[in-house]
Amino acid sequence: LPASSAASDVYKRQLLHFLTSSVNKKDMDAQLLNLWRCAYALTKRGARYDYPEKYWLGGTPLNETFVSLHQIIPQFKKRNNVQKVQCVVLTDGEASGIPVVTEFKNHDGEVRRGTSNVGYNSFLRNRKTGHVYNLSGHYEYWKFAETMLRDLKESFPDVNFIGIRITDRREFGSFLRMFHATEDEIKKARKNASFSIKNSGYDSYFAILDSSLAVD
């Protein structure tokens, strides 16, 4: 894109709001049914239902969700007139580094704009709080999410952040090793189909095997 293009034209994300407790039972049932139909159409070939084209699944927008929470949390507190909030993040995957807008010169010397991942020699600055975070140690891709959580916790000290990571049996062990779980702990966690992670960016973080869930 030309350098004159807006950064928002280069990189966009939309966080979708599927369900809400502010509706009556009839509308809630309709919301749940439509969500089930979308999920069924995405996972079953030859399904009678089709899904909206813009709902096609891509990567895990976890870091983008953390960015959105800086707006969602104040809006939620104001709308519901609450002071303390429990924020639960449910995900079935990790996120890679968040893309940023960069400028470069093409072979004609024209300045262009594109995207690239945040470099290891970069810093993250919260313009509102003034907090600055060094990203130099983020050679492990999941560490970026921990920095995003740290910024959220410093921005909203009255919010309790709880993470729930759904994982299949194949990746369960490797996921726990990311947080330095021992082999004995992993063996016990497989038996219990869950594990409480103590050294993450969340106030509480739980890994749950998908085989332990009631799946229809």
Model-found features: residue ranges?
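VWA/integrin I-like adhesion module and closely mimicked acidic/polar interface patches used
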Residues: S68, K78, E94-E185, N192, ...
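C-terminal helix of von Willebrand factor
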Residues: D184-D216
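Single conserved hydrophobic/aromatic residue that forms the stacking wall/gate
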Residues: L1-A7, Y11
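Structural motif
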Residues: K84-V88
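Charge-dense, low-complexity intrinsically disordered segments
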Residues: L1, W56, Y139
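Von Willebrand factor
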Residues: D9-V82, K143
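Active-site flanking residues adjacent to catalytic metal/cofactor-binding acidic residues
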Residues: T91
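Generic detector of low-complexity/intrinsically disordered segments
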Residues: A3, H17-S21, S211
